[in-house]
Amino acid sequence: MTESVDKLAEEFLHIASHLRLAILLDLHKTKTNLSTLSKKLDTTSSEIHRNLTRLTDANLIQRDSTGNYSLTTYGNMVCANIQSWEFFLLNSKYFSKHTFGNLENNFIQSIGSLHDSKHVQGFINTQDIWKKIYKNSKQYIYNILFEVSYDSETIEIIKSQIKKGIIINSVFSKKAIISEKRKTAVDDLDIKTAIKNQQLSRKISDDVQVLVVLNENEGCVMFPKSDGDVDVSEAFYGTTKSFHDWCLAYFQSCWTKSGSFYEEKMKK
């Protein structure tokens, strides 16, 4: 145990330098050579060379025959974890009042996928993001929801997308907060037809804590408060592939585990 801890501490020393960390993160974007790194990081070539040598000796980076440096498999793994730390540190104030809820370990371990995102604050602003995602959809809309809005603008967007053939899949919490306008919405002919044709599909989950709304290119995710309450007043919105892939994988996992939808389960 002591030996492994000592080895781990030694590995952390390799990235405990601002310059070495900057080199790693730059190489995580693209391979490059010594002179380019020197210009980018505004550091002498000799200092860059010294740190490149240390990172190479630590098996974090490698040099090819053309003189370009790139990350090793180990280096890529380290950078992936650095992104997780970065996401958490940049949003430390948010996470002082929020948790990861019931996220499985694989989603927590890949939380760095969300690092390139925008922190949206305010209930109205998060609702605007949802509507934006709905409007921008060209293929599908996927939701994991606790509070379900049936305001006229949202319903019109949904109906418009249904007419375009957009697939809509939603996981609702068994304890979902439902608007009194729900009955009118589900009785709408376009929506009833979409449900019948399975263009609009729904499932029920006993334990919804982390929420997502996404289309094929963008998404947003909302984490619960420290007391366990779902919070839709703040969200993280992103358009990168890594952000979207994380949201999609999480939705698919929840969709697979959720049960069949029955209208009588949805109480006002």
Language model features by range: what are they?
Residues S65-T73:
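Short, basic, alpha-helical segments at the C-terminal edge of helix-turn-helix-like DNA-binding modules
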Residues M1-L25, T36, L41, S46-E47, ...:
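PLD/PLD-like phosphodiesterase catalytic module centered on the HKD motif
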Residues T30-K31, N68:
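Residue at a beta-strand N-cap/secondary-structure junction
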